[in-house]
Amino acid sequence: MKYKSNIKVSIIVAIYNSDKFLEKLILSIIGQTYKNIEVILVDDGSPDNSGAICDKYAVIDSRIKVLHKPNGGCCDARNKGLELVTGEFLTIIDGDDWLEPDYIEYLLRVVLQTDSDMAMSLNIFTTRERIQVKFDKIETWTSEDAAIAI
């Protein structure tokens, strides 16, 4: 995807009490095969060590921005993150998720190849006992399709 590397993808992560999962998530983001990303970590008033973990990685990787805010809920955290976005495309990740190494590259390629404005990826939910696949394909939409669906 080097020919499209000028397209910046913004990643918003809403974080609340996610310190057990956060390093795995951040490492999966900064290890993406597609490098032109900005990462907006929104610490939603976590009383655990989440904020400190975010700050640690912001020092390590200049693509990471951290916003600390009082707890207002997931939607509020995402909305505050949206105020900082500078990318052409956006993905929103939860603080207890992680990404496959080619997540951004693959979805960006699908969007560009299909002339879509939005893509939804495969979601895999795991517990200690099992792995459950919720969606088994990539779905894409134009802006008009998405507006109609809402």
Positions of the model-derived regions?
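Nucleotide-sugar donor-binding/catalytic module of glycosyltransferases
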Residues: 1-150
